[in-house]
């Protein structure tokens, strides 16, 4: 098996960029400036006109590409750390490891990155994206169009499914909202799955029963009934592999995980891996990928990508709405120079009631991030 190397894209001769492509295959890398050649492990392979240099020049010191200080892997997720003395990745991930386990264990043989990705700029401070990712209150207002669309698709899908003899009784929503909320809470408690909680080290997550179906082991009437047998079979295999309780948590619940400070993993319409880096105080670069089980059939992969792009894609119902909301907030801050207030994230500080989160939402997960951020600034 090969090895993974992460190297600074910096020629050790005169600082040129050694690799100018975002992705691809190569056995060696040649700096375009003076033609120095390096191997995929970073080792120096060739110096043009080496005879012009002093004797022993190549061996005076390591002139290969420089590796990052720390590179660690947890279940196929690779993390770079620029602090050589920092705690181990295993310890840093803390409670987030359980969520990564649940994602990876959706496959019997491992997950793979689906070719392609999305890179886009957002004209706002990067921390606003973090807030938005854990915000329960914006969903039905910002994404109202998506819910209207989903209701129409579900109605048509149920009619088609029933006409083909597939029961959709489990997806009827005649019960009152209060009964539905209580059922949702009870379902979480039945699987010992918390709604929202601190995972340690600034990481956080929240879970909720999926209402839209999942392209892994949970069919939904908004999809063609031909997908149901294979999705049901996937669920049965998952139960046999990890047990009924964990299978239900993995397959029937959506999960949002934020790993401090700037990694988001959203497991709902598909599995989205997203990073967001500050370019300047009012500008960030967002990068997104999706992963899927290696053994997934072509039909289910097609369904997965449709589901993913429908909401999470760059032209989907979700991402453009979120970008507009975040950028509008940033414009508001900039325009109100006399405003000395703070972003209010006090929801959830009301007297504790197990049903409060289900009824109203909770901004506690945002406070987890800001508490850790304040700790870093203080130190």
Please place each PLM-identified region on the residue numbering.
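Rieske [2Fe-2S] iron-sulfur-binding domain
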Residues: 1-98
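C-terminal catalytic domain of Rieske-type non-heme iron oxygenases
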Residues: 69-379
């Amino acid at each position: 098996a090969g090895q993974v190397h992460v190297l600074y894209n910096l020629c050790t001769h005169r600082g040129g960029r050694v690799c100018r492509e975002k992705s691809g295959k190569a056995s060696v890398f040649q700096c375009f400036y003076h033609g120095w050649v390096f191997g995929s492990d970073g080792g120096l392979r060739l110096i043009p006109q080496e005879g012009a240099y002093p004797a022993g020049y190549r061996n005076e010191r390591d002139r290969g590409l420089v590796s990052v200080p720390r590179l660690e892997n947890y279940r196929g997720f690779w993390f770079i750390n620029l602090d050589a003395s920092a705690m181990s990745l295993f310890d840093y991930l803390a409670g987030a490891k359980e969520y990564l386990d649940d994602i990876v264990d959706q496959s019997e043989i491992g997950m793979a990155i689906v070719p392609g990705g999305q890179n886009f700029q957002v004209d706002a401070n990067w921390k606003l994206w973090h807030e938005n990712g854990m915000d329960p209150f914006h969903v039905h207002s910002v994404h109202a169009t998506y819910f209207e669309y989903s209701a129409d698709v579900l109605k048509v899908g149920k009619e088609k499914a029933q006409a083909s003899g597939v029961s959709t009784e489990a997806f009827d929503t005649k019960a009152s909202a209060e009964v539905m909320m209580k059922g949702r809470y009870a379902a979480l408690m039945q699987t010992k799955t918390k709604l929202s909680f601190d995972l340690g080290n600034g990481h956080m997550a929240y879970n909720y029963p999926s209402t839209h179906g999942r392209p892994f082991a949970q069919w939904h009437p908004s999809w063609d009934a031909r997908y149901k047998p294979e999705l049901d079979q996937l669920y049965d295999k998952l139960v046999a592999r990890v047990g009924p309780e964990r299978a239900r948590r993995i397959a029937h619940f959506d999960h949002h995980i934020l790993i401090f400070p700037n990694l988001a993993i959203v497991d709902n319409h598909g599995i989205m891996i997203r990073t967001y880096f500050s370019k300047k105080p009012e500008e960030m670069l967002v990068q997104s990928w999706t992963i899927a089980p290696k053994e997934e059939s072509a039909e289910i992969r097609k369904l997965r990508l449709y589901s993913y792009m429908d909401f999470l894609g760059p032209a989907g119902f979700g991402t453009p709405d979120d970008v507009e909301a975040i950028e509008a907030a940033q414009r508001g801050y900039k325009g109100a120079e006399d405003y000395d207030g703070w972003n209010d994230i006090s929801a959830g500080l009301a007297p504790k009631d197990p049903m409060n989160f289900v009824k109203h939402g909770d901004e506690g997960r945002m406070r987890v991030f800001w508490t850790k951020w304040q700790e870093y600034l203080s130190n």
